[in-house]
Amino acid sequence: MFTAPGMATTQERPYSCSVCGKSFQYSAVLLRHERAHGGDKRFCCLECGERCARAADLRAHRWTHAGQTLYICSECGQSFSHSGLLDLHLGTHRRRSRTRPCRLCGRRFPHVPALLLHRARQHPPEKPHRCPLCARSFRQSALPFHLARAHPPEIITVTAPSPSTLYHCTQCPRAFHSSAGLRNHSRIHVVPSLSDPGTEAHLCGICGKSFSKSSTLTRHLQRHSGEKPFKCPECGKGFLESATLVRHQRTHTGEKPYACSDCGRCFSESSTLLRHQRSHQGERPHVCATCGKGFGQRYDLVVHQRSHTGERPFPCPQCGRGFTDRSDLTKHLRTHTGEKPYHCELCGKRFTCISNLNVHLRNHAGHKPHKCPECGKSFSVASKLALHRKTHLGERTAECTECGKFFSHGRSLSQHQRSHRRARAAAMAATTTTTVVTEVTIGPSLTLTGPTEQEKSGLLVSPFQETC
């Protein structure tokens, strides 16, 4: 992580007020505080002339003119014009409080699902009985069943454990690096035993795969037939298994039962949560062979590699623009249709994607979690903080192609380029000559105009011109 020279840690408060002795972490915060002592009240109310030291104090004062009730946060004293905004703001305090403790280690969590996930991962129930073949652990009652199902002695032979352990098939010379690979392979050697119906295997007549239960074979055959018996009542989409339908229905209900124990973010599927937690652990197992950049999820690596190859497999059917990710295409299509499915319940403003709505809600709640380590200024999104920090570092990466001037923000460059366009338009207006043609009406239906180009050149004689 980037650390600026002389940057204070989260515990240090090196900037002290010379009047009251109060300490601050950032010099910019100290300057704002000292204005209250020095009488520097630069923010003036246009209604009554009242002056305030801070913009926040002026905003609170202006509500008194509007005759609206202020909703004050009992935790920090911040005021809001709407009870819904106060509720959103209070959520930031509730997330910090972490009121749900783990009875085993005392760690506190903001959500019950986060607590349950923590207990499952950090305090799993004891399973003292370890399988000697695959190292899985079980309670006493489950181990014999696992041995009978996963490691049938007539098929599997396991070599002595070593760093290069191989699992050898007793029916053919093939060997495998994992017991699961050997189990999948061993199905091709299993034949139904007519003499022992209890051990009869259920074979798929299409691909030859065998199953221990007829119900499992029936479910497998549905994959070949394309049958999807479980239909979503909302959109009609079909699924092979009921569990897949349950996960799909969460996209309609918005239910997200799996919460991250580190940041409280919720997800609709446990697999998505596990992939998300890699970002907290710093785990990036998927590495780009071209530039060496690491990713926590394989799909993110696939999308990233398209930036090297130039592949854009998702074209827009309206304008032909290509995208590297299907989700980017979905958001782009809304610019053509005008669809904005996500709306703010406080002000009614609508958005094309949920991430923009979340950023908008932070503005309502005054929640700005991204703080500049140099001056203490806070931002609601990380991208705005990154742009802001360029002003401290002196980076100017956006260059004007017309005059060569550099800017730290793309937005500043766009505003600058408008001045070039205005200058060009003014120059064109000044150099363009406009020909004014006057008309003289003679009689009710005869109109006399100025000379045409042909008449000027002498190629055509006007009927109203005398000839010699």
Swiss-Prot record:
GO terms for MF: DNA binding; zinc ion binding
InterPro entries: Znf_C2H2_sf, Znf_C2H2_type
Keyword Hydrolase found: no
Zinc finger (C2H2-type): 15-37, 43-65, 71-93, 100-123, 129-151, 167-189, 202-224, 230-252, 258-280, 286-308, 314-336, 342-364, 370-392, 398-420
Any single biological process term in GO: regulation of transcription by RNA polymerase II
GO CC annotation, single: nucleoplasm
Source domain of life: Eukaryota
SUPFAM superfamilies on file: beta-beta-alpha zinc fingers
Pfam families found in the cross-reference section: zf-C2H2, zf-C2H2_4
Compartment(s) where it occurs, according to its Swiss-Prot or TrEMBL record: Nucleus
UniProt keyword list: DNA-binding, Metal-binding, Nucleus, Repeat, Transcription, Transcription regulation, Zinc, Zinc-finger
PROSITE patterns in the record: ZINC_FINGER_C2H2_1, ZINC_FINGER_C2H2_2
Keyword Aminoacyl-tRNA synthetase applies: no
Described purpose of this protein according to its UniProt entry: May be involved in transcriptional regulation.
Family assignment from sequence similarity: Belongs to the krueppel C2H2-type zinc-finger protein family.
Protein name, UniProt field: Zinc finger protein 672
Gene: Znf672
